[in-house]
Regions:
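Glycine-rich, Arg-bearing micro-motifs that act as flexible, cationic patches
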Residues: 116-141
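Short, flexible loop segments at boundaries between secondary-structure elements
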Residues: 145-153
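Small/aliphatic-rich secondary-structure junction motif
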Residues: 7-61
Length: 153
């Protein structure tokens, strides 16, 4: 049995949903979940890609070229989700920002006053998880907004 809403309490509502994408299949799945929720709740969708500047240092090409390539990739990744959303009649805004992914996701979620943050989570080997953790885990543990974690199946 669901708990009753107490006098003076407002029911939870989602009018702004943030979906963070890295362009992966798991992010596409998370995007489909976010679109489904946004459509059903008449919520606005914000699609975010974070250019991981630390990754640009390890590409083996000039830093500026690497960042530009990651920005292009990010615009394509956000556009794919936006196109899916628009086909369903969901209002959508795209953002591509630079920084550490979990920090940027949390910052943008606060800036737009997101009611829900949706992120995908791909499997990591246990050694990687112990050493660095995943970006989605960092969002899950540090974000003050509700987070919906979509696991890769």
């Amino acid at each position: 049995m669901a708990p009753e809403i107490q006098e003076g309490q407002e029911p939870v509502g989602y009018s702004r949903i943030l979906i963070a994408t890295d362009g992966s299949e798991c992010s596409a799945l998370a995007g489909r979940h976010a679109i489904y929720l946004a459509e059903g709740l008449a919520a606005e969708l914000f699609v975010l890609y974070v250019v991981n500047v630390a990754r640009a240092f390890h590409t083996g090409i000039h830093y500026g070229e690497a960042v530009a390539e990651l920005e292009r990739f990010g615009k394509e990744a956000t556009a794919r989700i936006r196109e899916m959303a628009e086909k369903r009649g969901v209002r959508c805004e795209e953002r591509v920002v630079s920084g550490r992914p979990h920090d940027a996701i949390i910052t943008v979620s606060e800036e737009i006053e997101a009611d829900l943050v949706v992120v995908g989570s791909t499997g990591m080997r246990s050694v990687e998880r112990v050493l660095i953790g995943s970006e989605s885990e960092k969002v899950l543990y540090h974000c003050k907004r509700p987070v919906l974690l979509i696991r890769d199946t």
